[in-house]
């Protein structure tokens, strides 16, 4: 899929992140749960899906006809990057034919010993037609990844690295700066409410991913329980 076609499909809509990790209530070794989440999202009018693991992506593709942002979360201790962190994950995701592959593009030390620029270059050389989304935490990381060759940047990791601000809302400042610089941006991270989603789109971002506020019952219930307890 070409970049312009993808952006046209997801523009001004909601891409729903459908993920569950081992230890979470909706995770199943047998699979079959995330496709139902994706189906519900599609019925609601979602314009895309973000999914983790080859299994979930393939299962979702069978029942939902929406573009997918694919990732593979795999730990490589002691290094911190775990979202599509090496070429092994890239190869696995390309084989699924997912429309976009998202990868950690932070400035943190990587398991493979490459700089993020070297990693992006190696991906583009091996898979020149694959769309890439850079999961970043700061403006500098976003700008660097975009200049290195990714198609879109995401604010996915803002608040989750030592270099980024800790807050319980979207990084509006980062989003505004990226839009000002005309860097294609997919907003993601701590978008908890429809009001916040509207504010994010008012900034002028190209697309938006929402996960926890829609597909993580534990987070949703916790937010309500915490709110009524604050009397």
From Swiss-Prot:
Enzyme class label: isomerase
Keyword tRNA processing attributed: no
Keyword Transit peptide on entry: no
UniProt-listed InterPro entries: Aldolase_TIM, NanE, RibuloseP-bd_barrel
Superkingdom as given in the UniProt entry: Bacteria
Keywords attached to this entry: Carbohydrate metabolism, Isomerase
EC number from the UniProt entry: 5.1.3.9
Catalytic activity annotation: an N-acyl-D-glucosamine 6-phosphate = an N-acyl-D-mannosamine 6-phosphate
Gene Ontology biological process terms in this record: carbohydrate metabolic process; N-acetylmannosamine catabolic process; N-acetylneuraminate catabolic process
Molecular-function GO terms, alphabetical: N-acylglucosamine-6-phosphate 2-epimerase activity
Pathway: Amino-sugar metabolism; N-acetylneuraminate degradation; D-fructose 6-phosphate from N-acetylneuraminate: step 3/5
Disulfide bonds, paired cysteine numbers: none
Gene Ontology CC, one term: cytosol
The protein's role, per its UniProt record: Converts N-acetylmannosamine-6-phosphate (ManNAc-6-P) to N-acetylglucosamine-6-phosphate (GlcNAc-6-P).
Cited PANTHER family: N-ACETYLMANNOSAMINE-6-PHOSPHATE 2-EPIMERASE-RELATED (PTHR36204:SF1)
Stated family: Belongs to the NanE family.
Protein name: Putative N-acetylmannosamine-6-phosphate 2-epimerase
Organism: Lactococcus lactis subsp. lactis (strain IL1403) (Streptococcus lactis)
